[in-house]
């Protein structure tokens, strides 16, 4: 009997040794298919005071308690931003309700000279109710940009028809308010639909 028990334990250990790497590979494959890169450890985000699309104060502390997807852009953006928002609208419509309830999309302007709260509110209303827009002074915005790993180059102009160079990636922030990873462009909606519920369930 002791020999039999030892054999059973050995077989169980062997089965786990084979299964765990397989699970890790499956998870990594899902992340790759979704163009998601999770950080090996959380990264703190500085406390900053911004303004939302309703002209109300919005502290980065407000990010706590819920998962957020954040990206930088601007309302006059001709390509990246409308594409990102359209795809995010589609993704939110495809996600399970329980995942959607835990997740919030936030557009942070890289063009505060033109993107007033009212401008952000009007712009976001074309996509999905509940999407948040943030603005603030350039120093605060650049600090947040650096903390999130989403660079943008401030425009030298403040009037007229000008563009702003910015990253097409999105940041994934956990309910503790820390940076957890990035969703890289181009967005892969099928992969995101599969992997986001797992991330939200497993990465508390």
From Swiss-Prot:
Positions annotated to bind Cu cation: 77, 81, 166
Annotated coiled-coil segments of the chain: none
Top-level taxon of origin: Bacteria
Keywords attached to this entry: Copper, Metal-binding
Molecular function (Gene Ontology), one example: metal ion binding
Record InterPro entries: SCO1/SenC (IPR003782), Thioredoxin-like_sf (IPR036249)
Entry-linked Pfam families: SCO1-SenC (PF02630)
Family to which the UniProt record says this protein belongs: Belongs to the SCO1/2 family.
Protein name: Putative copper-binding protein
Organism name: Stutzerimonas stutzeri (Pseudomonas stutzeri)
This protein's encoding gene: scoP
């Amino acid at each position: 009997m002791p020999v039999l028990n030892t054999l059973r334990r050995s077989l169980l250990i062997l089965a786990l040794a084979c299964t765990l790497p397989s699970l890790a590979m499956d998870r990594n494959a899902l992340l790759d298919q979704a163009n998601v890169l999770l950080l090996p450890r959380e990264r703190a985000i500085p406390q900053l005071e911004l303004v939302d699309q309703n002209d109300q104060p919005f502290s980065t502390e407000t990010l706590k308690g819920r998962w957020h997807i954040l990206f930088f852009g601007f309302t006059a953006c001709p390509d990246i931003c409308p594409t990102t928002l359209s795809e995010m609208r589609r993704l939110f419509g495809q996600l399970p309700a329980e995942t959607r309830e835990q997740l919030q999309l936030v557009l942070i302007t890289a063009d505060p000279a033109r993107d007033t709260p009212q401008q952000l509110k009007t712009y976001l209303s074309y996509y999905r109710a509940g999407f948040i827009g943030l603005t603030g002074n350039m120093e605060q915005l650049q600090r947040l940009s650096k903390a999130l790993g989403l660079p943008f180059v401030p425009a030298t102009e403040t009037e007229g028809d000008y563009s702003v160079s910015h990253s097409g990636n999105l940041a994934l922030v956990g309910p503790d308010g820390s940076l957890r990873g990035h969703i890289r462009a181009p967005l892969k909606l099928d992969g995101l639909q599969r992997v986001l519920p797992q991330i939200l369930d497993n990465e508390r």
